[in-house]
UniProtKB/Swiss-Prot annotation:
InterPro entries: SDH, SDH_sf, SdhE_FAD_assembly_factor. The keyword Chaperone applies. It comes from Pseudomonas syringae pv. tomato (strain ATCC BAA-871 / DC3000). This is FAD assembly factor SdhE. An FAD assembly protein, which accelerates covalent attachment of the cofactor into other proteins. Plays an essential role in the assembly of succinate dehydrogenase (SDH, respiratory complex II), an enzyme complex that is a component of both the tricarboxylic acid cycle and the electron transport chain, and which couples the oxidation of succinate to fumarate with the reduction of ubiquinone (coenzyme Q) to ubiquinol. Required for flavinylation (covalent attachment of FAD) of the flavoprotein subunit SdhA of SDH and other flavinylated proteins as well. GO terms for cellular component: cytoplasm.
Length: 84
């Protein structure tokens, strides 16, 4: 189980100040992050260390991360909001 302190910290780190990222990351950390396994939680925290401009390109699907694991997390976040 994820502690409230950790979730609150991640919530604030997920708020990037760029609306396009905020609408993806904030709901993800609230709704999905608590149910992730430890590996994916670490991966999400690593994603948050990336530059906003890089993440913007990845989430707008203009580019892909050179790191396959980070790209997998990007895809996981996008898959929850895109119609199937």
């Amino acid at each position: 189980m994820v502690e409230d302190v950790e979730l609150n910290r991640l919530y604030w780190h997920s708020r990037r100040g760029m609306l396009e990222l905020d609408v993806l990351l904030v709901p993800f950390v609230r709704e999905v992050y608590p149910h992730l396994n430890d590996v994916d939680r670490d991966l999400y925290r690593r994603l948050l260390t990336c530059e906003d401009q890089d993440m913007f390109g990845w989430f707008m699907q203009r580019a892909e991360s050179e790191d396959a694991e980070l790209q997998r997390m990007v895809r996981m976040i996008l898959d929850r909001v895109q119609p199937k």
